[in-house]
């Protein structure tokens, strides 16, 4: 007697489900890193509100604002966004603290944007050095780097 079987048997279906489950377990963690990195990148433009007054202070008096108040910004905890719980200016450095809807792996972590200047020429615009990156040639970085976001979550420009 010949059997005309159509469709999947229960065992074949379980094998397919197991393979899909294994592929999902591999894919989800690799996507998590990308999502966290996107949150870091999304937070960086918030620093633009502090860059202008810092650059103006350097150009006018060759000094950098010591805090948010001197940079004419609200208190650090009042400058927030979806992934940022505070934006602090300290000696010209912009420190972004991650929080609010940020992934737990970066919540409470800091990304610093430090001004790089040419000491002898205030006219040359400030270059902003992100995170652990190095200064452009002939420029001096001002302030302390407080970046403690793991390198794997920093964009290439900040490593």
Where are these predicted regions, by residue range?
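Periplasmic/extracellular, small/polar-rich flexible segments of pilin-like filament-forming proteins
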Residues: 59-159
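N-terminal single-pass transmembrane signal-anchor helix
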Residues: 2-42, 46, 50
């Amino acid at each position: 007697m010949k059997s005309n079987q159509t469709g999947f048997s229960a065992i074949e279906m379980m094998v397919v489900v197991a393979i899909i489950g294994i592929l999902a377990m591999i894919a989800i963690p690799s996507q998590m890193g990308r999502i966290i990195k996107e949150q870091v990148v999304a937070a960086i433009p918030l620093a633009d509100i502090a860059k202008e007054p810092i650059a103006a202070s350097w150009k006018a008096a060759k000094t950098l604002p010591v805090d948010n108040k001197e940079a004419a910004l609200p208190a650090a905890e009042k400058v927030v966004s979806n992934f940022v719980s505070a934006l602090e200016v300290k000696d010209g450095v912009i420190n972004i603290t991650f929080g609010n809807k940020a992934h737990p792996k970066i919540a409470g972590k800091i990304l610093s944007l430090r001004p790089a200047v040419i000491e002898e020429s205030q006219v040359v615009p400030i270059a902003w050095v992100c995170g652990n990156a190095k200064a452009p040639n002939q420029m001096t970085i001002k302030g302390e780097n407080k970046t403690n976001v793991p390198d794997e979550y920093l964009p290439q420009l900040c490593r």
